[in-house]
């Protein structure tokens, strides 16, 4: 009887929503990584607490769910800076001033990249379901509300995430990141979505560090999908070009 009482709330929750939190999270990953590949011009606007802005542009390439290259074009002091993410959480960064490619060590992957509010891990992350367990903690007319907790053995700087998922598209509308003490740290919002070749793809994303009162807005322009990108793009040698 005690065992039945323990599992009854979980059974009722599953019947209430008709889908589990982990199933929703898998759908989120599937939608976010649906195109075979994509290339785009990325505009990054960095805004400090006084409202001052810095604008950076970069070429961005992605193939599948585990290959990504970002190469900065401007401003001049950032031109050529590149970030490469490969399978199995392998990441590299290239700074032209040093003329060398460096592998991103595990102890710095949660540091912010090139003055943005995104960490190396954020840039190299291709999904949530691999590292997080999800439970549905609420819903509204348009969204499921999930609480994501890191799976045992994963190395994450967050105690948990709170995610609002669109019921129709299964795109995350907003994700709140909470630090180890349970305080709100960062908020990611998808602020615009386009349908390209049948894929619902975010074209404007903001990431706000509420502690530093700093925000990064990413806008993706001239996006092309399923173009047959070569694997040669996702190499250390290509970073140096």
What residue spans do the PLM features occupy?
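Sec-dependent signal peptide recognition
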Residues: 2-10
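Hydrophobic h-region of N-terminal signal peptides that target proteins for export
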Residues: 10-18
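N-terminal mature ectodomain segment of secretory-pathway/periplasmic proteins
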Residues: 19-96
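A short, amphipathic edge element
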Residues: 23, 52, 123-135, 182-187
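Short, structured patches in soluble enzyme cores that scaffold and shape functional sites
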Residues: 72-74, 95, 138, 148-150, ...
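Acidic/charged, solvent-exposed loop-and-adjacent secondary-structure segments enriched in E/D, K/R, S/T
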Residues: 95-122
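Gly/Pro-enriched, hydrophobic low-complexity segments
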Residues: 100, 104, 124, 141-236
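Short, conserved active-site entrance elements at the starts or edges of catalytic domains
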Residues: 113-149
């Amino acid at each position: 009887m005690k065992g039945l009482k323990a599992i009854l709330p979980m059974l009722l929750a599953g019947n209430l929503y008709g889908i589990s939190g982990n199933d929703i999270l898998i759908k989120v990953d599937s939608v976010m990584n649906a195109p075979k590949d994509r290339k785009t011009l990325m505009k990054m606007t960095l805004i400090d607490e006084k409202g001052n802005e810095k604008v950076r542009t970069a070429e961005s390439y992605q193939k599948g769910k585990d290959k990504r290259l970002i190469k900065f074009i401007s401003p001049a002091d950032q031109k050529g800076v590149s970030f490469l993410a490969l399978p199995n959480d392998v990441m590299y960064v290239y700074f032209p001033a040093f003329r060398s490619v460096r592998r991103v060590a595990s102890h710095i992957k949660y540091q912010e990249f090139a003055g943005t509010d995104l960490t190396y891990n954020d840039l190299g992350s291709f999904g949530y379901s691999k590292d997080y367990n999800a439970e549905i903690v609420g819903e509204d007319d348009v969204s499921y509300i999930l609480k994501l907790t890191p799976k045992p053995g994963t190395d994450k700087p967050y105690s948990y995430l709170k995610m609002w998922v669109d019921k129709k598209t299964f795109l995350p509308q907003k994700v709140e990141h909470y630090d180890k003490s349970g305080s709100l740290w960062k908020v990611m919002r998808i602020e615009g979505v386009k349908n390209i070749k049948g894929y619902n793809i975010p074209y404007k994303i903001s990431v706000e560090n509420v502690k530093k009162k700093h925000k990064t807005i990413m806008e993706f322009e001239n996006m092309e999908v399923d173009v047959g990108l070569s694997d040669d793009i996702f190499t250390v040698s290509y970073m140096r070009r």
